Amino acid sequence: LPFFIYFEFNEIKKFNFNLRKVFFFTLILGSVFGMANILQQVSLLYTDIANSAVFTVLYVVIVPLISYFIFSIKIHPSIWPSVTLCLIGGLLLSEVKNYDVRFGDMLVIIGAFFWAFHIIFIYKVLKIFNFPIAIATFQCLIAGIFCSFPALAFETVTINLISKEITELLYAGILSSGVAFMLQAYAQRVLSPASVAIIFSLEGVFASIFGWILLNQFLSEIKVFGIMIILLAVIFSQLIPIYGKKNYGRI
């Protein structure tokens, strides 16, 4: 909210836009964002983190498929080999030994579709309302309201419980949600949804590296190989279009 007020509030007042249309799409965006978060959090009660990581990375495949077949967004040929590499890297990184699909895994898979639509909807909203900080601000506000209803209905929320986890909640609310998704919206002004999905697969890479640095978690040779494959996929998806434009005058 402070970033929105400082950087975009005055600019928005000068911009002529359809308020009803922007509100409608932002409402959908915030609701999808809220539902994706709910499914991700609840799924961890019924599955382990490794399985969750494997099935969440499915949005790397889902985003280009939905983009192309539903929204008719052009997909650069470099995306498909990059998607394949991301899936292989994600499997190696998680080192899942049990591939039985459980209830929690199903929630993660459904959540992957919501995360995919979230990436695409940000892309669509930016086409009609190119104010990424405002979009990020109001999607978080709507998602917060959306998530509060099931939280109050199915959980016992008390000030005492909140105070015990206040550091984690502030980190998740301010940095993981506020700042991170603001940067995502800002970056999507120039990136396609499929490219964003591939770059997001780096989440598992950073989680493994910081788990090794901060928590002394063992980083096996297989995980290191998975990290290298995902990095290769991201580099490939970004450099090939640039190379094609430079040498052949097209993307």
Predicted features along the sequence, with ranges:
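Membrane-interface interhelical linkers
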Residues: 1-28, 41, 46, 68-81, ...
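C-terminal transmembrane-helix exit sites in multi-pass transporters
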Residues: 2-8, 59-81, 205-225
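C-terminal-most transmembrane helix of multi-pass membrane proteins
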Residues: 5, 165-167, 175, 201-251
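Hydrophobic residues within alpha-helical transmembrane segments
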Residues: 24, 28-31, 58, 80-85, ...
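Hydrophobic/small/kink-forming positions within alpha-helical transmembrane segments
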Residues: 30, 34, 38, 60-65, ...
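Structural signature of hydrophobic alpha-helical transmembrane segments
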Residues: 41-59, 103-114, 163-175, 228-230
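Helix-helix packing/entry segments at the starts of transmembrane helices
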Residues: 52-58, 122-144, 177-213
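Hydrophobic transmembrane alpha-helices of multi-pass small-molecule transport proteins
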Residues: 75-95, 112-115, 147, 222-241
